[in-house]
């Protein structure tokens, strides 16, 4: 994983790469944005780059030093992750804060990634705040959330805030094309457009729907098969209704709407 592999967040990843290159790092970062746009992935890439012993000129991790190898092999003792959705008690935070006292063994920093940080209990937030107010010099926190408004203002004020954008449809389509070519999957561009629209700005959702469509279509993703698999109403139906209305064919409109309802769609939408 590299910063360049993060889709649709170029300005944000450039800023993070520049921070790695300059060595001017904050003690706390807050990554905000909708689900599936790369917050946790970016946090991991950033954490690895921060501790890389020989970062590239572009601010990417070298993937060759001991710190990078340890991270890639999931045996790093300097990068910790906590899923606050399922570990949100004050005891969980206190256990994590105990780790901040021990300096890093390999690399420059101990990096703590707390995902879904808004799920922490009030007591846990208060316990975390004590460390955040006066963090050890060797500690960096990267917090990720989909609901920034639920985080205490005293926490937010101590973080550098990065707002992740929703994926655009063209960005999603371009990435899905790359995935399709890599996997040897053929596709119709209209089909990828339907998948991108269905993902609602989330790359993770887009990839999940893409995998589902690829399985259903047996490696040849077509528009007709995708709308059938995803139960999406064909756009031609809308045009047909408009044409019939312009021709004052009320009876035909009712027949078409009835057929749509019989397929399980809600005529009101």
Label each PLM-derived region with a short phrase.
Residues 1-161, 179:
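P-loop/Walker A NTP-binding region and its immediately flanking N-terminal helices
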Residues 73-76, 92-95, 108, 160-269:
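Extended, largely alpha-helical regulatory/partner-binding modules appended to the mid-to-C-terminal parts
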């Amino acid at each position: 994983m590299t910063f360049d592999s993060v889709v649709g967040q170029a300005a944000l990843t450039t800023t993070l790469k520049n921070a790695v290159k300059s060595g001017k790092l904050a003690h706390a970062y807050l990554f905000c944005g909708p689900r599936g746009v790369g917050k946790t992935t970016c946090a991991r890439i950033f954490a690895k780059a921060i501790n890389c012993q020989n970062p590239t000129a572009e601010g990417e991790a070298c993937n060759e030093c001991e710190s990078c190898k340890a991270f890639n092999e999931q045996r790093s003792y300097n990068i910790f992750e906590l899923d606050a959705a399922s570990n949100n008690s004050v005891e969980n935070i206190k256990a994590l804060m105990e780790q901040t006292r021990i300096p890093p063994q390999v690399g420059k920093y101990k990096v703590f990634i707390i995902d879904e940080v808004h799920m922490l209990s009030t007591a846990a937030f208060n316990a975390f705040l004590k460390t955040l107010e006066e963090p050890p010099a060797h500690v960096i926190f990267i917090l990720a959330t989909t609901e920034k408004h639920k985080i205490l203002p005293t926490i937010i004020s101590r973080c550098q805030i990065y707002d992740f954008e929703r994926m655009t449809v063209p960005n999603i389509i371009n990435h899905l094309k790359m995935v399709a070519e890599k996997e040897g999957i053929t596709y119709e561009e209209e089909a990828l457009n339907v998948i991108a629209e269905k993902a609602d700005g989330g790359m993770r959702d887009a990839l999940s729907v893409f995998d589902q469509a690829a399985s259903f279509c047996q490696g040849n993703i077509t528009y007709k098969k995708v709308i059938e698999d995803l139960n999406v109403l064909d756009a031609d139906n809308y045009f047909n209704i408009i044409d019939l209305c312009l021709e004052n064919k009320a009876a035909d409109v009712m027949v078409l709407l009835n057929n749509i309802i019989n397929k399980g769609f809600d005529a009101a939408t």
